[in-house]
Amino acid sequence: SYKEMLDSSIKYIRNTITEAEVGSVGGEWAVLALARYGYEDPEWYTAYYNNVVKYVQNIGSNKLHSRKLTDNSRVIIGLTAIGADPTNVGGYNLLEPLANLDDVVWQGINGPIYALIALDTGDYEIPELPDDSTATQTTREGLIQYILDKELEGNGGWALWGSKADPDITTMAVQALAPYYNANAEVKAAVDRGMKAISDQQLANGGMGSWGTVNSESCAQTICALSDLERDADTDLQYVKNMNSILDAMLSFYIDGGGFAHAAQNGKLSVNMMATEQATYALVSYDRFKTGKTTLYNMSDRKKLYTESAEKKSVEKANVTVADFGLVYDGTAKEPEVTVKYGDILLTEGVDYTKKFSNNVEAGNTAKVTITGM
């Protein structure tokens, strides 16, 4: 049954990825699958969280890629899934770059699709652009409109390029739009057109493929889209051909012992990690639908699955400012006000750091303030 395949694939991912890191394989999608499945392993999630903090601090910016904001969106999805706060990752707010709609859409339709998904995972407020910015402020309406405007003429659906609906991009767009399906007639009509366009491409074996090859990832994204729309990927007649459902088609790529193949090569299947992660979170999405839970990306039910490290916070890269005013040394200790910032986050004395003054009594000395991370 799909449940057994799901259980063993969760274990396969956990055993294969000993430590998840920021990345499109072995990273956020694996974390998403395990976290939304309800797999408990605080050490594993904590290692991932600490890796994200290190990664962001090494870049030294809240923009994880110079141009593509899908990196930010993907990490926001991973962090939210484990109950972490994407607005303070080692002192950086990963939501902030998504406030600039021009930057979000720079890479094409993928940008707004994943920005909308990421923002909705935690129902996050979109940060405001600075007053002096000439860029377009991102809003949910703006993201939805951008996606709707990119719908293909004719039969509908979406694609990165060309005039034929692409299964992956179309079903990803549907996943982004799904929360607005019932409330917005324009969204509903576009989603219905897209889901029909993709159904028309489904092959006799129930399979789906971008670029003419049936592959498990295209099936996986379609299953996620159907689950988000509260439609059953195993019985929904629009997605059953010759008694083969889209779920059957994806499960045909399963490999005993856990794991999924990308596509059959010379009739043989071999485990592919990206395919395994996508198929597994698609099964999580399907299982959540079957058991009446919130959708894969509606994380209003999230729990904190990791533990914040008890190790001391390093403040060596923090900016320490001492209020500068003429102090006259008269034999009593002087303690000017001190501000400590990490990235763009103001740190709190007694929570993040302690301070100690030295040489601050007698004139002629160089007074010093020492900030120590807690």
Predicted regions and their residues:
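Terminal, non-catalytic domain-edge segments
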Residues: 1-8, 249, 262-311
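An alpha-helical repeat/solenoid feature that recognizes helix-turn-helix modules
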Residues: 16-42, 62-87, 104-140, 152-192, ...
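Core helices of alpha-solenoid repeat scaffolds
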Residues: 49, 91-95, 140, 144, ...
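Fold-core signature of tandem repeat domains
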Residues: 158, 208, 329, 338-340, ...
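Surface-exposed, proline-enriched loop/turn segments that connect beta strands in immunoglobulin-like
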Residues: 211, 321-324, 357
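Solvent-exposed, low-complexity, repeat-rich "mucin-like" stalks and linkers
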Residues: 310-345
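Serine/threonine-rich, repeat-prone extracellular segments and beta-strand-based repeat modules
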Residues: 342-374
